């Protein structure tokens, strides 16, 4: 009888031990899966941040971030290489330096008295710009008959999966090599308030072997001038045949950019040239949407006086009236009337 009692006791203890061991293994596996999930989520978010960008030239502005046109643009961390000259620089500072460089190149492109830069260097700038603003090339290869488009595609595609931050750094370095004093020249130009803006130092020629590239550069320039608040150069673009409602890759017109950056004088000049105040970007937002979200009351009121529609809805179903959270009396009256 004692033997049976001892055997039963051993079996019970064995079952309890097996249960506890199984429970411990289950807890360890659950912890491992949760940790792996967190790691994957972090990796996905980091990749997303590194691949998001703004696609068009960014103008020189006192603001560190664009409020609407660049609100979804996220930059990854700075390159961690020990020999990187930009190590430790805040992403906003790098963005500002890149914005200044791209604005300089855009301004330079519209000047016919240009310093000639080889096609090879121009293509390098183009490829770096596309990586910095759009990420790795995913576009199909153009036809061999379209020489310029194919050359530009190759310049972009050969950079592979270069991080946007590295592309911005290389772009700035290349512009600095071509014209070491460009930063000083740009600063002097911005500081001359009330004076007529003269040439911005040596400027870069467009790709010379096909006309389409020159037109594309000018269209980029008109958006850059609107962002910078460069009224005279913007008007020169329009006089040279660039449409006042020319759109960038996100469907934004110069008026969108002028409103986004708070340039009332540019907005007035564009409206005088018959700019469409109700033009929509790719997300269905008009310049008035931008003014409302950016809380630029003077610009919003100006647009409304120019017959901007307060009821146009964007892709999310929101009109400027819907988005307006500010206590603007004249806007409240329109809300009440609707």
Swiss-Prot record:
According to UniProt, the tissues expressing it are described as: Expressed at low levels in roots, stems, leaves, flowers, and siliques, especially within seeds.
Disulfide bridge partners, by residue number? none
The segments labelled Disordered in the record are: 69-89
Report the function annotation for this chain.
Answer: Binds medium- and long-chain acyl-CoA esters with very high affinity. Can interact in vitro with arachidonyl-CoA, barely with oleoyl-CoA, but not with palmitoyl-CoA. Confers tolerance and binds to lead ions Pb(2+), probably by promoting lead translocation from roots to shoots. May function as an intracellular carrier of acyl-CoA esters. Modulates negatively sterol synthesis during embryogenesis and gametophytes development via interactions with SMO1-1 and SMO1-2; sterols serve as lipid modulators for gene expression of homeodomain-leucine zipper IV transcription factors.
Q: Where in the cell is it found?
A: Cell membrane; Secreted, Cell wall; Endoplasmic reticulum membrane
Q: InterPro entries recorded for this chain?
A: Acyl-CoA-binding_protein, Acyl-CoA-binding_sf, Ankyrin_rpt, Ankyrin_rpt-contain_sf, FERM/acyl-CoA-bd_prot_sf
- Chain positions recorded as an acyl-CoA binding sites: 126-130, 152, 171
Recorded protein name is Acyl-CoA-binding domain-containing protein 1
Q: Where is the composition biased (Acidic residues)?
A: 77-89
Record-level GO BP terms: fatty acid homeostasis; lipid metabolic process; lipid transport; regulation of seed germination; regulation of seedling development; response to abscisic acid; response to cold; response to lead ion
Q: How does it assemble?
A: Interacts with RAP2-12. Binds to SMO1-1 and SMO1-2.
Is Cell inner membrane one of the keywords UniProt gives this record? Answer: no
- Modifications after synthesis and translation: Glycosylated. In seeds, localized in the outer integument.
Name of one Pfam family that matches: ACBP
This protein's UniProt keywords: ANK repeat, Cell membrane, Cell wall, Endoplasmic reticulum, Glycoprotein, Lead, Lipid-binding, Membrane, Metal-binding, Repeat, Secreted, Signal-anchor, Transmembrane, Transmembrane helix, Transport
Q: Where is the ACB domain?
A: 94-184
Topology versus the membrane:
Single-pass membrane protein
Query: Which sequence ranges are marked TM in the entry?
Result: 11-31
Q: Which GO terms describe its molecular function?
A: fatty-acyl-CoA binding; lead ion binding; lipid binding; phosphatidic acid binding
- Residues modified by carbohydrate are 35, 41, 191
Q: What induces it?
A: In roots by lead.
| Alphabetized SMART domains for the sequence | ANK
Where do the ANK repeats lie? 217-246, 250-279, 283-312, 316-338
Q: Might you report a single GO cellular component term?
A: plastid
Say which family it is in.
Belongs to the ACBP family.
């Amino acid at each position: 009888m004692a033997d049976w009692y001892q055997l039963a006791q051993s079996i019970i203890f064995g079952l309890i031990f097996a249960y506890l061991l199984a429970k411990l293994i289950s807890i360890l596996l659950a912890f491992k899966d949760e940790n792996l999930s967190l790691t994957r989520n972090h990796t996905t978010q980091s990749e997303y941040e590194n691949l998001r960008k703004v696609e068009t030239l960014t103008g020189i502005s006192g603001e560190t971030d664009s409020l609407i046109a660049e609100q979804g643009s996220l930059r990854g961390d700075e390159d961690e290489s020990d020999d990187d000259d930009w190590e430790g620089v805040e992403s906003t500072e790098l963005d500002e330096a890149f914005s200044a460089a791209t604005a300089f190149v855009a301004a330079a492109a519209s000047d016919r008295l240009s310093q000639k830069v080889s096609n090879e260097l121009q293509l390098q700038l183009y490829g770096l710009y596309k990586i910095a603003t759009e990420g790795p090339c995913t576009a199909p290869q153009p036809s061999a008959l379209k020489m310029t488009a194919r050359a530009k595609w190759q310049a972009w595609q050969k950079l592979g999966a270069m991080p946007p931050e590295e592309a911005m750094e290389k772009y700035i370095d290349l512009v600095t090599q071509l014209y070491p004093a460009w930063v000083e020249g740009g600063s002097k130009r911005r500081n001359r308030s009330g004076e007529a803006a003269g040439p911005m130092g040596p400027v870069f020629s467009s790709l010379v072997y096909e006309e389409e590239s020159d037109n594309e550069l000018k269209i980029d320039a008109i958006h850059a001038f609107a962002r910078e608040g460069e009224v005279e150069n913007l008007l020169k673009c329009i006089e040279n045949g660039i449409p006042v409602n020319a759109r960038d890759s996100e469907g934004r017109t110069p008026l969108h950019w002028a409103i986004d950056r708070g340039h009332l004088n540019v907005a007035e000049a564009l409206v005088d040239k018959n700019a469409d105040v109700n033009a929509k970007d790719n997300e269905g937002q008009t310049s008035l949407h931008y003014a409302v979200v950016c809380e630029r009351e003077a610009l919003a009121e100006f647009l409304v006086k120019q017959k901007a529609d307060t009821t146009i809805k964007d892709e999310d179903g929101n009109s400027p009236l819907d988005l307006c959270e500010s206590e603007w009396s004249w806007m409240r009256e329109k809300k009440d009337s609707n």
